[in-house]
């Protein structure tokens, strides 16, 4: 274990000592028969039932998992892989170089944590990896007696629920978040697919928790805005000159100059541009400015088949099904003269940062995470531990070559490719942008050099293309980390020529991304090489307005390489500065999102409480008490002199709450009360009438249908108001920076206004819930003579479904809709449905508990 001598990490030293204990058990479990080894899972579970901690069985569980991996996959995890697994079980990030077998490393910690029966989720960056790992690693877990599930997009709810109920669930990261949001939009608790978020192990953790940290997961609904405003602001922005706006190259922020503001005021006929009344227009204008002057085609997005497709700037892949939110997507559509989609309304949203922080325990694997350790600690409370390679790295990382111009750089790149190709050494060229990969593609065509291009426009058979990049003579151009997760294995001939040569055409915004590109070469001790070619024209230098200065200093070099340590230090300094800025930006996003997170936690908790309660009468009565205090605050109930208008109060309460009740408020009900006493008096009467109505409904329909109606009334009001609140907070977030002009703190203002909005949200939920409950259509029978009558519904095929009158009014349409769906089903299934509908009330009620069983 000489390679461990220099490791100083406390976690690593702890893992090293545990590794010795694990190795000491090798002979013990090697002597076990297959059945004896499999039975250890039951032994561990029995110990856990007796409140033995996971930590106390960790050593044995890891040793068992190691032996099982060998027997099933014929691969015995290396010592460094076991150490990596221990780091993961500590709830930290294990940094393992590319090709070191992170997937095998995950087996032991996943096995150990799955023994509790609370569920373990393994999150991957795409569905291909989720399917692959669930199949391959799943063999080991199933052999050991654990169940393995695969969660995919567009799966039916029942299959998703089954996948999450497994001991171990593999899933792409985005679907985990969307399932969480959808679970908090269901109408019954039984419809949820996820269980408690216990332990998540994230593969490529830096990609998900760092690169995609700012990207919110959004479930959208109905249209919220007209498209005309996008067209108008787009037309206006096209008239602007470069003196009308200013771009901060460092932060990519864009704002109108004083001249631009005057031009805007004149165009839109405003006296004052920056006030909250004009915030909607300013928001659209900012999006149009950003779309035209900051967002670059073939960099952040591409246009394919008349559609705007987003490009992951870190991988170069198209992000399927993703779009910019808050109107930026529509602004880009207007810019590119494609059809403008109506902006959708946000129904639910959460960032990856806040979703994964919901897990009780979190860990992750990556090839490059140490440079972002402070962010992992600050936001996720996860340390990053570097795991040594099993075999020393043999790759040679050559110093970068720097050129004055973009053209000179690519001229040198082509010459280098020609030199390497002449001796059949395989080359992987990494570019940061689609347009650069296309540019190099044209240059290589002119030189008659056979090559393959992999970018957002050319991404078919990605894994296959990347896998073949190690064949002797292969030239592969890929945007950044396309093909991440797929091994590049050089053949024997290419290894003789020096192995895979990774050629980077510019430095990225993070050293981590550059290290990922280098890591494609030299896996498991293979030989390999890497070198970066960079120029003063590169975005890294342009962002800090250093381009002209450096070009003037080094003009004498023309097309030749710049030999100067100062310029290389400038690139390193710029890269570190951008890393810091991006971290601050992600932390700022988290601060704002934490305001919504706290509110979301309250709403979702209340929502679950409503779904789980069998009797909501106390909840309704508390709403009545709360609402009664709010009613007399309504301004329209007061005269010009400020006195409470009792007549207006009577009319308002009767109209909103007493439509179907025998009782009606009169002036006499309030004349003998002072204003301070009215809320309590009003509350007492409303509760009395509510109890009478509920008693009637329970007697006629049963407790379950009555509670079901009340539950749906409250959930409906809660969902509607919460969705409105989310969109209101979105708009506030976009416009709040305007308060800087009045010397106010935007975040403080956002928090204060957001809190007031949330307090109003709570009141509005109670108000709307009561309006529905107190006007329950089923209660209209209270004022009629005679018995309930069953209703017969004739379906399209002529058959008749009989619906008992004691079925709550609000779900009758859902029953009919489901019946129509069943027209396509077998006759036997329809008979079961009709039998249940016509059976005694208890059976009907049971069916209503879970509409997915209808």
From Swiss-Prot:
Pfam families: P-loop_SecA, SecA_DEAD, SecA_PP_bind, SecA_SW. It is a peripheral membrane protein. It is found in: Cell membrane; Cytoplasm. The keyword Disulfide bond does not apply. GO terms for biological process: intracellular protein transmembrane transport; protein import; protein targeting; protein transport by the Sec complex. It is an enzyme of class 7 (translocase). Keywords: ATP-binding, Cell membrane, Cytoplasm, Membrane, Nucleotide-binding, Protein transport, Translocase, Translocation, Transport. ATP binds at residues 81, 99-103, 487. Its main location: membrane. GO terms for molecular function: ATP binding; protein-exporting ATPase activity. It catalyses: ATP + H2O + cellular proteinSide 1 = ADP + phosphate + cellular proteinSide 2. Its EC number is 7.4.2.8. One of its GO terms (cellular component) is plasma membrane. It comes from the Bacteria. Monomer and homodimer. Part of the essential Sec protein translocation apparatus which comprises SecA, SecYEG and auxiliary proteins SecDF. Other proteins may also be involved. Part of the Sec protein translocase complex. Interacts with the SecYEG preprotein conducting channel. Has a central role in coupling the hydrolysis of ATP to the transfer of proteins into and across the cell membrane, serving as an ATP-driven molecular motor driving the stepwise translocation of polypeptide chains across the membrane. NCBIfam families: PRK09200.1 (NF006630), secA (TIGR00963). Belongs to the SecA family. HAMAP family: SecA (MF_01382). PANTHER family: CHLOROPLAST PROTEIN-TRANSPORTING ATPASE (PTHR30612:SF0), SECA INNER MEMBRANE COMPONENT OF SEC PROTEIN SECRETION SYSTEM (PTHR30612). This is Protein translocase subunit SecA.
């Amino acid at each position: 274990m000489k390679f461990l001598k220099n490791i100083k990490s406390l976690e690593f030293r702890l893992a090293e000592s545990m590794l010795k204990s694990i190795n000491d058990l090798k002979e013990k479990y090697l002597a076990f028969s297959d059945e004896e080894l499999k039975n250890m899972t039951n032994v561990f579970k029995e110990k856990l039932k007796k409140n033995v901690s996971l930590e106390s069985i960790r050593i044995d569980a890891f040793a068992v998992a190691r032996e099982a991996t060998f027997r099933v996959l014929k691969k015995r995890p290396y010592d460094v892989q076991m150490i990596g697994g221990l780091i993961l079980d500590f709830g930290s990030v294990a940094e393992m170089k590319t090709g070191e077998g992170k997937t095998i490393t995950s087996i032991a910690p996943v096995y150990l944590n799955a023994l509790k029966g609370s569920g373990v989720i393994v999150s991957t960056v795409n569905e291909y990896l989720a399917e692959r790992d669930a199949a391959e690693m799943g063999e080991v877990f199933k052999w050991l007696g654990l169940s393995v599930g695969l969660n995919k997009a567009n799966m039916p709810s029942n299959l998703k629920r089954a996948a999450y109920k497994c001991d171990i669930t593999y899933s792409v990261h985005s679907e985990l978040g969307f399932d969480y949001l959808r679970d908090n939009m269901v109408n019954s608790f039984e419809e949820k697919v996820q269980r408690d978020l216990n332990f998540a192990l994230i593969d490529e953790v830096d990609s998900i928790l760092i690169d995609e940290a700012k990207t919110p997961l959004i479930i959208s609904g109905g249209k919220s805005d007209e498209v005309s405003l996008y067209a108008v602001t787009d037309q206006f922005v096209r008239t602007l000159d470069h003196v009308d706006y200013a771009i901060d190259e460092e932060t990519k922020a864009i704002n109108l100059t004083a001249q631009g503001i005057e031009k805007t005021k004149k165009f839109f006929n405003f006296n004052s541009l920056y006030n909250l009344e004009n915030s909607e227009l300013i928001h659209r204008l900012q999006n149009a400015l950003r779309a035209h002057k900051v967002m670059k085609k073939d960099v952040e997005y591409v246009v394919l088949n008349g559609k705007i497709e987003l490009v992951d700037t870190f991988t170069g892949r198209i992000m399927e099904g993703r779009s910019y939110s808050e109107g930026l997507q529509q602004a880009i559509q207007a810019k590119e003269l494609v059809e403008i989609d109506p902006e959708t309304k946000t129904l639910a949203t959460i960032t990856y940062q806040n979703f994964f922080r919901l897990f009780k325990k979190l860990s992750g694997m990556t090839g490059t995470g140490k440079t972002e350790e402070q962010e992992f600690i600050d936001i996720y409370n996860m340390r990053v531990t570097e795991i040594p390679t099993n075999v020393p790295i043999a790759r040679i990382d050559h110093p970068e070559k720097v050129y004055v111009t973009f053209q000179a750089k690519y001229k040198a790149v082509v010459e280098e490719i020609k030199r390497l190709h002449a001796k059949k050494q395989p080359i992987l060229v990494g570019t940061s942008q689609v347009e650069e990969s296309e540019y190099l593609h044209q240059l290589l065509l002119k030189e008659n050099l056979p090559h393959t291009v992999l970018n957002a426009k050319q991404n078919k058979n990605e894994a296959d293309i990347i896998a073949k990049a190690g064949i002797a003579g292969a030239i592969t151009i890929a945007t950044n980390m396309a093909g991440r997760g797929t091994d590049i294995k050089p053949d024997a001939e290419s290894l003789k020529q020096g192995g895979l040569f990774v050629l980077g055409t510019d430095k990225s915004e993070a050293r981590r991304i550059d290290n990922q590109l280098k890591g494609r070469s030299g896996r498991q001790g293979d030989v390999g090489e890497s070198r970066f070619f960079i120029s003063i024209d590169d975005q890294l230098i342009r962002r800090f307005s250093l381009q002209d200065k450096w070009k003037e200093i080094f003009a004498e070099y023309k097309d030749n390489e710049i030999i100067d340590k100062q310029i290389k230090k400038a690139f390193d300094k710029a890269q570190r500065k951008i890393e810091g800025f991006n971290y601050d930006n992600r932390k700022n996003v988290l601060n704002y999102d934490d305001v919504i997170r706290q509110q979301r936690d309250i709403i979702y908790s209340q929502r679950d409480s409503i779904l789980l309660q069998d009797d909501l009468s106390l909840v309704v009565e508390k709403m009545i008490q709360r609402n009664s205090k709010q009613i007399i605050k309504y301004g329209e109930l007061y005269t010009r002199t400020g006195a409470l208008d009792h007549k207006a109060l009577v009319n308002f309460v009767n109209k909103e709450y007493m439509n179907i009740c025998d009782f009606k408020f009169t002036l006499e009900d309030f004349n003998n009360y002072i204003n301070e006493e009215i809320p309590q008096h009003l509350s007492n009467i409303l509760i009395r009438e509510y109890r009478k109505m509920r008693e009637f409904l329970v007697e006629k329909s049963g407790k379950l249908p009555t509670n079901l109606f009340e539950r749906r009334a409250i959930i409906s009001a809660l969902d509607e108001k919460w969705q409105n609140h989310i969109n209101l907070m979105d708009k506030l977030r976009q416009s709040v920076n305007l308060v800087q002009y009045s010397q106010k703190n935007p975040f403080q203002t956002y928090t204060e206004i957001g809190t007031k909005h949330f307090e109003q949200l709570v009141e509005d939920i109670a108000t709307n819930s009561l309006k529905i409950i107190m006007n329950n259509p089923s209660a209209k029978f209270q004022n009629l003579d005679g018995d309930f009558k069953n209703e017969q519904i004739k379906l399209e095929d002529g058959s008749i479904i009989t619906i008992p009158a004691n079925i709550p009014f609000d779900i009758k349409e859902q029953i009919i809709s489901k019946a129509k769906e069943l027209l396509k089903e077998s006759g036997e299934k329809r008979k079961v449905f009709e039998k249940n509908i016509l059976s005694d009330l208890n059976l009907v009620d049971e069916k209503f508990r879970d509409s997915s069983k209808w």
